[in-house]
């Protein structure tokens, strides 16, 4: 008997992204940090993880392309991103605060979605198969 991994597979991503679209729209419309946190608090854990994954991919890509300065908060971001996949329901509004306060949220999300689309169509490595 094979046990299903608790982590999303590549095949899961189209549905997860589709389910996250309303939250993504609300996040992009949110004018304040507090509203962004409120939007995420209204979401299911799957949606939060999908949104965060998109942000992480976008942020990491921009960092690698050196479009953003290297500074101390980047180390915090890397630690935060590493823990996303084990995010628990009660922690939803905690560590997410770092990213939701960023002013370039739109750029992170658009870059992350672009990477996932490429990954899903070309068999890349961004969408996790298993852990």
Residue ranges and their predicted role:
Residues 3-10, 17-24, 29-33, 37, ...:
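General marker for long, soluble alpha-helical cores
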Residues 49-59:
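Short, hydrophobic/amphipathic alpha-helical patches that form generic packing surfaces
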Residues 62-90:
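Mid-chain, well-packed structural core segment of small domains
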Residues 53-54, 66, 124-125:
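Short coil/turn segments at secondary-structure boundaries
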Residues 38-48:
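Structural motif
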Residues 79-131:
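Helix-rich interaction surfaces within compact, conserved domain-sized segments
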Residues 36-40, 53, 97:
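Amphipathic alpha-helical segments within well-ordered protein domains
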Residues 38, 60-63, 100, 117:
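Beta-sandwich interaction modules
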């Amino acid at each position: 008997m094979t046990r299903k991994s608790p982590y999303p597979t590549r095949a899961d991503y189209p549905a997860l992204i589709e389910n996250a679209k309303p939250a993504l729209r609300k996040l992009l419309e949110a004018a304040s940090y507090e509203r962004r946190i409120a939007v995420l608090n209204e979401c299911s854990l799957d949606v939060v993880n999908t949104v965060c994954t998109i942000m992480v991919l976008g942020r990491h890509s921009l960092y690698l392309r050196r479009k953003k300065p290297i500074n101390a908060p980047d180390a915090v971001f890397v630690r935060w991103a590493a823990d996303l996949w084990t995010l628990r329901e009660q922690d939803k509004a905690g560590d997410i605060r770092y990213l939701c306060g960023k002013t370039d949220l739109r750029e992170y999300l658009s870059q992350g979605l672009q990477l996932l689309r490429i990954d899903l169509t070309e068999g890349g490595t961004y969408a996790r198969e298993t852990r």
